[in-house]
Amino acid sequence: MLPPFYYKGVSDDGIFAFISGVIDKVGSPALRLFLYHIPPMAVVGFSLDLVGRLITAYPGTLAGLKDSSGDWSNTAALLERFPGFAVFPGSEVFLLDGLRKGAAGCITASANVNVLGIRKLYDNWQGPQAETLQAEITTLRNTLQAYPMVPALKRIVAHYHNDPNWAAVRPPLVPLGQAQSAALIADLGKLGFTLGERPQAKAA
């Protein structure tokens, strides 16, 4: 759940009142809420103190937080201050460091095209290949970030499935142009990238 972000410069008290109002109105013990901290987009975010207040007020409801601040120091502070609280870095760049501090995993847009590489690190983060696996997924992420992220991900799927319909995006986003698309696919080719597919079920 995002904080209310239309008004900027609002206080922790105001955000607390908004979140608590939603929880109280739902009024269900089954509710599990994940906070979405993404100040690069929303500008408004969840401070450490506010997260602590919400966890204390709703210990059975506040289930976790996705930290898309891009600021490792903030993610690390969340992990250190709230052990047992499910914190997910918003980029796989921080996956290994996060897991070593108790992160639950990561929630990242680029998993749409690199789920196998990211999952491999998640499964082997305590093994001898962990640093190498992290370097590989970081290199790919940095390549993707050199382009508008969502149009780039859509273009990759379109290219590897040979289906241009996948490249469509909703306004106000616009698809990558021909030059950018060609450059992106060339950059991926240099990395030996392939779009991993799920195994096909065998016929009985």
Regions found by a protein language model. Give the residues of each.
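Solvent-exposed, flexible loop/coil residues
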Residues: 11, 50, 76, 173, ...
